[in-house]
Amino acid sequence: MQIFVKTLTGKTITLEVESSDTIDNVKAKIQDKEGIPPDQQRLIFAGKQLEDGRTLADYNIQKESTLHLVLRLRGGTMIKVKTLTGKEIEIDIEPTDTIDRIKERVEEKEGIPPVQQRLIYAGKQLADDKTAKDYNIEGGSVLHLVLALRGGY
């Protein structure tokens, strides 16, 4: 099937894909056509950033759907969020992202609503309206995720 990828410059790229293709595969096809390395690509569909390991079918992307390609700035940063079970979730952030935005990214990957998340870094609970930069969260930083019990603050 054919899908379209629209860049910020307004250019539209046509790609031949299968619904079983992963987002990684799609990024590789964009690299073949446009020469943009996959690690600099962010693909958006229906307002959501698409995760590399998922397939087009997972996002209900059908023939003639249009994805939006946003280039990742060099300032983009990869952090880890560690859950109580010891699982580490990798999240791509910008220094200007709010803690609330980081919680939304955790929700996209893990399905945990932001209201149930408490993020801890350097022994401090992080406030939703502050940014990663406010807490000096940088590439490679590890945040700890604690689940808030209902009614608990």
Curated annotation (Swiss-Prot):
Keywords noted in UniProt: Cytoplasm, Isopeptide bond, Nucleus, Repeat, Ubl conjugation, Ubl conjugation pathway
Glycyl lysine isopeptide (Lys-Gly) (interchain with G-Cter in ubiquitin) cross-link, renumbered residues: 48, 63
Cross-link (Glycyl lysine isopeptide (Gly-Lys) (interchain with K-? in acceptor proteins)): 76, 152
Domain Ubiquitin-like, first and last residues per copy: 1-76, 77-152
Bilayer-spanning residue ranges: none
One Pfam entry name: ubiquitin
GO cellular component, one term: cytoplasm
Taxonomy, superkingdom: Eukaryota
Proregion span(s): 153
Protein's job: Ubiquitin exists either covalently attached to another protein, or free (unanchored). When covalently bound, it is conjugated to target proteins via an isopeptide bond either as a monomer (monoubiquitin), a polymer linked via different Lys residues of the ubiquitin (polyubiquitin chains) or a linear polymer linked via the initiator Met of the ubiquitin (linear polyubiquitin chains).
Family that this chain belongs to: Belongs to the ubiquitin family.
Miscellaneous section: Ubiquitin is generally synthesized as a polyubiquitin precursor with tandem head to tail repeats. Often, there is one to three additional amino acids after the last repeat, removed in the mature protein. Alternatively, ubiquitin extension protein is synthesized as a single copy of ubiquitin fused to a ribosomal protein (either L40 or S27A) or to an ubiquitin-related protein (either RUB1 or RUB2). Following translation, extension protein is cleaved from ubiquitin.
Name of this protein: Ubiquitin-NEDD8-like protein RUB1
Gene source species: Oryza sativa subsp. japonica
